[in-house]
Amino acid sequence: GWPLGMPLVEHLGGEIWEVRTKLGNRIVRVLFATEGQTMVLLHGFIKKQQKTPGPDLDLAKDRLKQLKRR
């Protein structure tokens, strides 16, 4: 399995995970899922508030659904 956990990675629910990092003075997040041994990057954004914004999480979920339909 993947060695995932805080403080760098947080499970947001279902199959969606969030990688946390900083880019200069900005807080950056990348939402991803795993398919076997592959990490699938779904959406990245600069975070401006404490909680992951709903539209960003929804976009990642939609992209994961599209991927699974293939």
What function would you assign to each model-found segment?
Residues 1-27, 36-39, 46-70:
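Basic, Lys/Arg-enriched alpha-helical interface segments
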